[in-house]
Amino acid sequence: MSQNQETRGFQSEVKQLLQLMIHSLYSNKEIFLRELISNASDAADKLRFKALSNPALYEGDGDLRVRVSFDADKGIITISDNGIGMTREQVIDHLGTIAKSGTKEFLTALGQDQAKNSQLIGQFGVGFYSAFIVADKVTVKTRAAGEEADKAVLWESAGEGEYSVADIEKKSRGTDVILHLREDEKEFLNEWRLREIIGKYSDHIGLPVEMLTKEYDDEGKECGEKWEKINKSDALWTRSKNDVSDEEYKAFYKHLSHDFSDPVTWAHNKVEGNQAYTSLLYVPAKAPWDLFNREHKHGLKLYVQRVFIMDDAEQFMPNYLRFMRGLIDSNDLPLNVSREILQDNKITAALRKALTKRSLQMLEKLAKDDAEKYLQFWKEFGLVLKEGPAEDFANKETIAKLLRFASTHNDGCEQTVSLEDYILRMKEGQKAIYYITADSYVAAKNSPHLELFNKKGIEVLLLSDRIDEWMLSYLTEFDGKQLQSITKADLDLGDLADKESETQKQRDEAFGSFIERVKNLLGERVKTVRLTHNLTDTPAVVSTDNDQMTTQMAKLFAAAGQPVPEVKYTFELNPEHHLVKKVADIADEIEFADWVELLLEQAMLAERGSLENPAAFIKRINKLLG
């Protein structure tokens, strides 16, 4: 008999997710069982952990399991566990809302492409709501461990905008999820179909999955029913890696991560000695939807002596490797370990160092063995890996080897060039690795600063990710070679520089008075004015000194709301350009000023992508064209 019944509306994001899921996941329906069994496994893990300090929570039943049964006549499948269970408040929090920041924005971003939506929703993690892929009504009966039998809760919904919740009596702790299948989903009301799905997705979770099977006597007559364990239910990571197949590793990854895609690669290691632990690390194929969300939870599952302790233990991985998935099972940490204890712990620090090294080795091996797969990985996680040089000084050189960039060596904008590739192609006498940063690949590719390098056939890395400038403030050299921006006024090409000819010397002297006129006109608005022979097609550029903040870094500061120090540019003019020659011959000071201002504004526009006063620029162009 239910009491205290109320009907509540789903959070708007839940409604939207349910509709998207029903229409986008029709080709992958069977994952509902994987998700619900994974939830049951999590509930068992949480009970084990809480029972460490309060054994009474077991209520005399410490054999944790999940049971799957079906009734073909009634059209229902039931998934029951004897795990931690839920209170009424927890039911409303967990089954009526999605407590993930950024969910609304994520759902809004989903388009009409159902195949793409399927993949994105898989990255989001649908969990309990996957039940509605096959069911037109879902009933949940649950009682939290340690609560009285009359403190159980009944939750029910048809997935159409609202749900009901009521108090009921339930003798056993844990949760029963009852699925009332749609008419066209009756294929799942079959013992062998359910066994197949459980074997495929849940064979190696650390919890027995049982099904009710018929018993027969010696004469072959049905004589009853019994619960039969149908999965291996061993902790996969405790087995020798030689005894685990690739398919088993992939299936376990999907259980662990709730991801739909296979991982790119994985590493399974058992370490003995001062630190005894087992790790199983995976590199995902796709970035999670909230990878760059500050509140995004990441980290490894932590076990101590095979006992689950916590999800998302971020203390074992640096932030720039937050995309890594997997688990660590330590023999040395105490069973009562907390996040606070992990924060300042020598064992944690040693494990973090070892797991970081292992993760980087996995990526190095992937880059070496399968360049195509590595580039797929780079497209998904390259921006995150670029955080590494600033965060991890000890592994900076290793991280630098894993970075990929666009370059003038290639035609496209794909980031495929490593620093090692670049060094192999360096010109004789070249001492630095040259790069340029810009707002976009197109802006970098067409920068006038490239003209001399293109003429000499010197490769330049084209950097256009927002993080690049910040990364390069920490990554200043690689393999003994300085990384040098080609937009700097004090750029030194060393042996690659052209020797000044007598003709150039005479021309420069002839332009001396012109340079002085420009300096007097611009005054304090620029640091200095000078001639340059680094341009071929462009009349003028602006550049900064090595000790000054670059244009891109100034933009980063401004975007972050930080105060931006004034940047004074060096104004460089090309004496061989016909426009500069024309301006140098203008006697009228007003006309001269207009042309100099125009050249400066053009150079500033090419460097910064914008002007402080675009209206004045347009007015000046119109005046000079008229």
Curated annotation (Swiss-Prot):
It holds the Pfam family HATPase_c_3. It is found in: Cytoplasm. Keywords: ATP-binding, Chaperone, Cytoplasm, Nucleotide-binding, Stress response. One of its GO terms (molecular function) is unfolded protein binding. Residues 1-339 are annotated as: A. Signal peptide: none annotated. One of its GO terms (cellular component) is cytoplasm. The keyword Endoplasmic reticulum does not apply. Residues 556-626 are annotated as: C. InterPro entries: HATPase_C_sf (IPR036890), Heat_shock_protein_90_CS (IPR019805), HSP90_C (IPR037196), Hsp90_fam (IPR001404), Hsp90_N (IPR020575), Ribosomal_Su5_D2-typ_SF (IPR020568). PROSITE patterns: HSP90. Residues 340-555 are annotated as: B. It comes from the Bacteria. Molecular chaperone. Has ATPase activity. HAMAP family: HSP90 (MF_00505). NCBIfam families: PRK05218.1. Belongs to the heat shock protein 90 family. Homodimer. This is Chaperone protein HtpG. It comes from Haemophilus influenzae (strain PittGG).
